[in-house]
Swiss-Prot record:
Keyword match RNA-binding: no
GO cellular component terms given for this protein: chloroplast
Primary site of residence: plastid
Keyword line: Chloroplast, Plastid, Stress response
Pfam families referenced in this protein's UniProt entry, alphabetically: HSP20
Domain of life, per lineage: Eukaryota
Record domain sHSP: where: 40-155
Protein source organism: Chlamydomonas reinhardtii (Chlamydomonas smithii)
Protein name: Heat shock 22 kDa protein, chloroplastic
SUPFAM superfamilies xrefs: HSP20-like chaperones
Annotated localization: Plastid, Chloroplast
Length: 157
């Protein structure tokens, strides 16, 4: 992610701004949890997610390319929905003595936490993985009735 180009314009000609671009990009990537781009290094990232609300449910769609159902975990604890995933890579060759010439794919993991709204039904949560997209469905329930205001008598001394 390179936000600094939008702030400073094209600064390729100025070494100060080039180094500043790198520093700003590192800071932004670290803050956002973006995986390093170096080939073969594992990283932690925020999986791109959409949260969609319908009249009957909330749906969370998370991109998890290269992951299957065994690679992701969805947990609920004290009203917080935790979604984690990890993609591991194994560099294998078909024949003994084979050699990996180039390795550009990276292993990575992600972890996100979401506080459920009070109208979420935690007992009906489902999760399914299809073509590298995790879909977590949280059905809605009627929110608890708000208590009527209670008037407290004020007495004099």
């Amino acid at each position: 992610m390179a936000l600094s180009n939008y702030v400073f314009g094209n600064s390729a000609a100025d070494p100060f701004f080039t180094e500043m671009d790198r520093a700003v990009n590192r800071m932004i990537n670290n803050a956002l949890g973006v995986a390093p781009t170096s080939a073969g290094k594992a990283g932690h990232t925020h999986a791109p997610m959409d949260i969609i609300e319908s009249p009957t449910a909330f749906e969370l769609h998370a991109d998890a390319p290269g992951m299957g159902p065994d690679d992701v975990k969805v947990e609920l604890q004290e009203g917080v929905l935790m979604v984690t995933g990890e993609r591991k890579l194994s560099h294998t060759t078909k024949e003994a003595g084979g050699k990996v010439w180039r390795s550009e794919r990276t292993a990575y993991s992600f972890s996100r936490a979401f506080s459920l709204p009070e109208n979420a039904n935690p007992d009906g949560i489902t999760a399914a993985m299809d073509k590298g997209v995790l879909v977590v469905t949280v059905p809605k329930r009627e929110p608890p009735a708000k208590p009527e205001p209670k008037r407290i008598a004020v007495t004099g001394a």
